[in-house]
Each structure stands twice: as C-alpha cells, then as structure tokens.
Amino acid sequence: MFYGTHFIMSPPTKSKLKRQSQLLSSMLSRTLSYKYRDLDSTFSSLGASDDPAELSTQLSAPGVLKVFGDSVCTGTHYKSVLATGTSSARELVKEALERYALDPRQAGQYVLCDVVGQAGDAGQRWQARCFRVFGDSEKPLLIQELWKPREGLSRRFELRKRSDVEELAAKEVDTITAGINAQARRLQRSRAKGTPTPALGDARSSPPPRLRRTVSETSLSPVNALPAAAQGPEEPGPDAMRYSLYQSPHLLLLQGYSQQHDSLVYVLNRDRHTVGQRTPSSKPSISLSAPDILPLHCTIRRQPLPDSGQAAGRLVLEPIPGAHISVNFSEVGHRTVVLHHGDLLSLGLYYLLLFKDPAQAQPLPARALARLRAVPQSCRLCGAALGARGAASPTQAALPRRQQLLLEFEPHLEDTLLQRIMTLIEPGGDDHKLTPAFLLCLCIQHSATHFQPGTFGQLLLKIARLIRETVWEKTKELAEKQAQLQEPISLASCAMADLVPDLQPILFWMSNSIELLYFIQQKCPLYMQSMEEQLDITGSKESLFSCTLTASEEAMAVLEEVVLYAFQQCVYYVSKSLYICLPALLECPPFQTERRESWSSAPELPEELRRVVSVYQAALDLLRQLQVHPEVASQMLAYLFFFSGTLLLNQLLDRGPSLSCFHWPRGVQACARLQQLLEWMRSAGFGAAGEHFFQKLSCTLNLLATPRAQLIQMSWTALRAAFPALSPAQLHRLLTHYQLASAMGPMSTWEPGAQDSPEAFRSEDVLESYENPPPIVLPSDGFQVDLEANCLDDSIYQHLLYVRHFLWGLRSRASPGSPGRPGSGASQPVCPEGMHHVVLDGHLEAPSCPLAPRDPGPAAREVAPERTLPLRGAPWAQAPPGRQPSRGGSQAGPPHTDSSCLLTPPSTPLGPEPGDPDWPESGGPCGKALPERQRNGLSGLRGAAPEGDSAALAEESPPAPSSRSSSTEDFCYVFTVELERGPSGLGMGLIDGMHTHLGAPGLYIQTLLPGSPAAADGRLSLGDRILEVNGSSLLGLGYLRAVDLIRHGGKKMRFLVAKSDVETAKKIHFRTPPL
C-alpha cells in the first residue's frame, strides 16, 4: 500500500522504451569498461593505433590474444583466444590447443613462450632472437604490461612443444659463466685452507690438482725420494700445489663427516692454523662441518726448536677447553701436544686425520700402521657403518640416534612384568595408546633372542590370553551396566557421552592387539628359523620346535579372536544408540523452520540430524583417540553406515504409509536431511562409503521427492530405469502406497510389466537383510609399532624407561645391597661414606667440583666405618643392555672433601633418624617439616666424597609417564616437580646411594629443610630419587657432576623424581656414627 500521491500505471510508449534501452546499453558498456580497465590502461598511452612491437595483442581488439603455433601446426600462422589480465599460461595453452584442433588434455606437453625477435618486411619470415617459457601459473598479459622489448624488436606469444624447448635448452650450455664461477670457488677454498691456487690461464691449460677426490702423492705408501723441484726454493708455478705436499706437513683425511664439504688434504704451510666449524663470527683456516666441532676447536702452530736458529720447527696442537680431541686414541685434555709423523688425530666423534711430515722422508712408523688397522669402521656416536653414513645429510647426521631399544628381564620376573604392562596405561589418559603393544613386542623380542629355545611361544600364549581376559572383563562390565538401564530405552539412556568411557578399554586393547598380531606374523618366522638352527646345533628333537610353532599359531588365533570380538561389541553398542535416534529423520514434520542465528554463515543442522551426526562423530573421535588402525576404523564406520542405511530403508518401506511418508512434502524433507548427512560424511572423509551404503535409501527418497506432475507421466519401465537401485518388490511397494491425492489411488501405468510381475509381488523381498554387512579385513600395512625405527615417540620411550626402573626395583628387593656374602673369605675394599649436599644457592663464585678434590683441612674430614662393597647381589651389578657398571676405586683412610662443595651450613639438620616420632610412615604426608627441636641438634658436615668419584648409574632413569598411568601405591611412582630457588636455595640434602646402606647408585634426597621450596611443595620426601634435572638425565653422571648440574640449573628448575618406599628411605637416611 502506498501513502501520499496515487500513481496511475500505464503502458510505456515506444520513445520511452527506446530511451530505456539506450540507458541499459550505456550501463553495460560502463560495466565492461570496469572489467577491462586494468588491461586497457596499459595501452592508453599509446593512442588509438596498435603497438608495432606487440604482435599478439591489438588495442582495437582488447581481450583477444594471438597465439602463434608454427611449430605445432604446420601451415597455420596464429589462432586467436580470449584472455584477460588474470588468465594463466596454463589456461591459455588449453584454449590454444582447442583452437588448433588438438586435445586440451595434453596441455602438459605444450608450453607458452614469450618470444622476442625481429619482424621483417612483407614477405620476410619472423626471426626469433630469444624466448622465455611461461610458468603454468604466470599471467602473460600482466608480464607483457610490466616489460617491453627494446626498440627495433617485437614480441609475440608462441605455442611450442615442451620436448622441443627442453632439447633446445640442453644444447645451449653456458661454459663461460660456469668457468668463472668454478674459478671463484677454487679461490675461496684456497683462501680458507691457506694453499696456493694456480692462475686462471694456467688452470685452463692443465687440470687443477684433484685434492678432494684422490690421494695423489699423499698416499699411505712410503715416500722413497723427494722430487728435484723440492730441493731448492722456487717460485710458485703451475705445479706449486703438488710440490707443496712434498714440502709442507699436512693432514690426510681418513674419516670425515660430509663428502660435500670435507677436503682430503689440509696443508699446514703457515705458522698458525685454526681448526673449527665455520660460523658467521668464526672463519677458521681449516673448516670442519661436524656438529660436535666447536667454532674454534684447536690451534696448530709452528714452534721453533730451541737449539736451532732456523725458522722451521715442530708443529704443536693446542686444544681449546671443551673440545674433544684425541691423539693416537688418547685424550689430550688441556695439554699441548707435539705432532709427530704418523700421528692419528681424532677431532670430535667423526673426524680422523693422519699427520704426515714429508721433511722426515721416512715410511710411516710401525705403531702408526697398527693404529690404522685398529681404526673403528663404525660411527662412535650412532654405531652405523661409516660407508653407509656418507650419503646422509648434515641435518640428519647432526641428530643423535636413540640408543638401542631393549627391555631385558629375567624369566622369573616375566609374570610380574606382564601384569605391570597390562595396567600401565589408562585408556582415557594422555599417554600414547600403543605403549603396551610396543613394550610387549620388546618382551617377545628379548624372550626369543635370550631365553631358552621355545620359551617365547609360551610367552606369546600368555600375552594373548591376558589380553583376551581383559577384553572379556571389560565387555562383561559394560553388559552389566547396560542391563541396569531402565526400559524402555530412551535417548537419555543410550547417550554416547555415557557410552564412550566404557568403550575406551575395549577399543584400546583392540588397537594394541592389531599391532601385536602384525608383529608376531612378521617376526615369528624369523625367530622360528633361528630356533631351528639352534636345535640343529644342539641336536634337540623336533617336539620343542613343533610345540613352539603350535603355541605361536594359537596366540595369533587368540589375538584375531580379540580383534573381531572387540569390533563386534563396539559396533553393537554404537548401533544401539543409532537405533534410537535414526527414526527421527523420517518422523520430522515437513518444511519445519530451522533456527539460525543472525551471525551464522551456514544453517545449523536440525536437532534430529545433529543427534545422528554426533553418534558418528563420537565413534570416529574415539577410534582416532585410541589410535585404531585407519583401515579398521574405516571398516567400523562403514559397518555403522550399512546399519543406518538398512534401518532407515526398512522403516520407510514398512512404516512409511502409517507415518504419511509416501507423499511429496515428506519426501522432499527427508531427501534434504539425507543430503545433509551425506555432506557431513564427505567432509569427514567417508563420502564414498556413505553414498554406497545409503544408495537405496537415496534412490527411494528421490522417488518420493519427484513432483507429482512428473511422476504420473512415468511408466513402470521408465521408473525402473530412473531408480535402478530399487528391486521390483520395493518399487511396487512405494507406488501402490504413494499418496497422490485424497481420492486418487495408484496410476494404471505404474503396474509392473509381465517380466517383473513375479518379483514385484514377493513381499519377502521388500525389506533389506542385515545378513550381508561389509567384511572385516585385517590390514596388511600402515602399522606404527616398529622396534627398529630411528625416531620413537617420547611418551613410549618414557614408559620404557619407567618399566626398566620398575624391573630394577624388583631386583633390588630380591637382592638388597648388603655386605659381602658370608664365608667368602675375600677381603673387600672399604668404601667411605658419600658426600652430603644441601642445594642452597646456584650462583656460587667457586668453580665446579673437580673429580680430584683438594684437601680443605682436617676440620672437614670424617672417616666412615669400613664396610664391604656389594658384589653379585647388588642391584647396580645388573646393568641394562649395553651398559657396564663402572666405578672408580675407593681408597681406605680419611677421604678428602672439596671446600667449594660445602654448601650445607654447620647448623643444618640432616633429618629424623629411623625410629624417631617424626620418621615418615607408609602413606604419610611427603616432605613433612622437621620439628623445631631438631633444627640445631646436629652440627658439622657429615660425609665426604672419595677421590675419583665417577660412578655411573647402572640403570635407566625413567621419565615420568602421565599421572593417570601409574598407581600412587607403587614404589616406582614417578612424578615431576618444579621448584624455584628461595633465599636459602632449594633446601634439599642429596647423597649418593652407593655410600648408603642401599648400596645402589643414584642421587637421593636425604634431608629437607623446613620452610624451603622443596619442603613446601609437599610431594618430596626423604629417600626419593632424582632422575632428571631440567630434562637432562643423570644417567652416567658422577655425584659431583650431578650436584653441579643442579647448582647451575637456574632459578626455576624441573626435577623428575622417583618415589621410594619406606624401606628404601630408611636405608638412605640411616647413618652409623663416625669412628
């Protein structure tokens, strides 16, 4: 309704129509001018005439590009294609191929070229001077706008074959520029190494000496005679480099790091050479590229002889502090070493060089030849063969490889170890979900390679049965919980949020069983082959071999049973949730309005569809969280799609008439819901599976969504052709119950033909069967557990270290550190009591504690009682693979203490003694503050450090697994503590476990100062063991170095601590009064 002036509508006149058409045409022309404004602005300065330098474009025909194709199609000059400023070269190639009647799908075999040449007069051919190939994504018209050919030359775009262009480019090799750059590189190398380089003219006449590729005259064979040119001084000429090898000492590379950067010979013809790694701030004269080489690693200088007035003298090597240098496989340390002919220099972990002095003119000494034979053929860092490592990139070689992954245990600890691994990981935690499979594979590997033949077969059976029992118990608990739900089943009773925690352990062990099954299938034949060879050697019977083979086959069958059973149980319970929420997709009212927020860019899913999608998404998230193999996860989703599609189709065909689903509005609504569901499946990566298992339902809904006017015109034959996925019985069911109008029945044209009549009236063929689900196929690749992998997940490695620590605890319980065996009769060396530190301040002026302590005076001396060292029964004697316990010899008598390490004030108490009221009991609070009466009860420093204290820890230090992965009641509980230094430091008194009654290596807490950060944390207690400091493991560190690492760890520090039981804490704390 209009308010105000009333308008009278009348048909327009011819003049008005003409005027409107003119306005419309002018508007369209302005619109087009905006589109090509950028393109036309290029030629605006050229006037109305065409540019003679541009042969492929014309101002009079903007947007038209001439592509010349003489080399592609003989007899054709050019073809015109439409182009804009944003057209890419790839698109123009396709358009040009269509214009030349060639297949556009072969566009990869052609390229568009920007050719600059000279267009002759009439009748003369085009002469190309140079050309450039356009990249596929380049914009030819934009490049044409940015640069122009110089005056007198023209430019045109040509279509050429890629093979012709590559052949032409291969013929034109720029030898002049390459020679200049090669000479520049030679000059740069000669300046870096201090060696003369021949002139450019001489280099062309004679090839340069190939020092980087051949041993040349510096081979290991003896030098028989010096050349005549070396007998007198001579100006450097073309052979100066070759002669300098006879005149000057040099280093011959035997083992290097990088074939690309290392030189074979380093000539020492200066008074001073610096050796190191080249950095922006350091440019040594001898550059080495290994990562463990310091920017300034060492210095080699010429030292004049004291009794000789000649300038020539001997060469000495001066190491830099912190550099790893060995001469003849002996550590240099901080001392200066005189180099002799035939010495072997080891720089870092990679470089091995032979020092040769031609002035001595003698064969290599016999000791040098013996050392050469003893050169290790493997890398001292990673153990890899040096020949195989040569092709490795510096980045890969710079990363230290993880040590060999082993899990050693004794046969009597097998059951306890398996039980600990089975309960190590909580399925709902944050740890790596395949940790049990990895650890169990390590157990199988150790049993097969170290135990008696046939033992690992029983271990396989034991593992498989444990997993089966665990899965059975979890599914039994889930079934009992589901049975307690109230009937009838509702949406609230079968929510996925309540179902996920119960499905986690089942899927968790299904995932680990898949990895274990593949490992057994791959490794068991190798173990059996090795076992067969051992049985042949020992002459055993075949019964043991057959029993082991039978046990392994039975174990694989049990694991397959676990996988299939867990798969079935998970599908059953998820399908139970789908059974409740799927029918709502068909029962929703037609054309209901969807709520959508004003800021929402896309409509939200309707509630009934959102519930279905949430079930799929929860199942998918659960499979990915528990790291189920992707193929198995896809098969489980496919099974859920099969169930959903079959259920919806059967409900539609069975209950469709009663739900009023067989008419057009409901068909359109249900079809839209299905399309939204399929769109989600495509976004989740399961589009193909969704379309396959929902094909019949989609076909049914498309029929119901067909407009009535179109549907009544279709015959039975046409409907069969339009909806081929439906069987005759299903199509007949839909057509006979389709609701055209209130008084109209089915059309006569919908009657089935004579050929389909028998099948159309079979009522048993209407509903789909659930008996043909997609098959469950175990995967054959894509597994994650690999014991030989170079890179291992940190979480798995942490739990491996934890299990090693757990085994160490079992061994220490079985054989506690006690004095020597009675009746041995052998005299044992005495062991002084270990040093005791309270970490107070990390910023001390005193240097770090040396391994050879100084005598601070008699006031700081105490003598510990003599006791024997534990031998076979000691836990530290059972070292893990690849590590031997080593300890410096202890000396009897009063030990010396370094004054720089006396961090404990004289009034610091050492904590309660066993039996005192304040001694912590089992389960009591950790880190309880000491009573006031004990603060000044003791004075003086107890304990001392023996000389040469370099004890190596004999067991692995386990980083902490997640808090949900380990029971707090276990004495091997590992946790992380972050402490910040206070005014008095950290407030922890530390002691070496080897100097206590525990008799095991390690850094243990012996005291906690009241009110200190360590006591205030509340988790630390006496007897706890420090495993890591700021991520640095204390494995292999001596006591003094470990304490020094803590002292200089910064203001905020992070400790990895292993909780000890009360018995261990008593052994750590108990001290005998000094004699």
Curated annotation (Swiss-Prot):
Residues 183-237, 872-967 are annotated as: Disordered. Coiled coil: none annotated. Residues 314-389 form the FHA domain. Residues 976-1061 form the PDZ domain. GO terms for molecular function: GTPase binding. Residues 225-234, 950-967 have a biased composition (Low complexity). Keywords: Cell adhesion, Developmental protein, Phosphoprotein. The modification Phosphoserine is found at residues 206, 216, 219, 221, 393, 890. Pfam families: DIL, FHA, PDZ, RA. It comes from the Eukaryota. One of its GO terms (cellular component) is protein-containing complex. Residues 497-764 form the Dilute domain. Transmembrane segments: none annotated. Downstream effector of Rap required for cell adhesion and migration of neural crest precursors during development. PANTHER family: DILUTE DOMAIN-CONTAINING PROTEIN YPR089W, RAS-ASSOCIATING AND DILUTE DOMAIN-CONTAINING PROTEIN. Belongs to the RADIL family. Interacts with RAP1A; in a GTP-dependent manner. Does not interact with members of the Ras family. Interacts (via PDZ domain) with KIF14; is recruited to the microtubule network restricting its interaction with activated RAP1A. This is Ras-associating and dilute domain-containing protein.
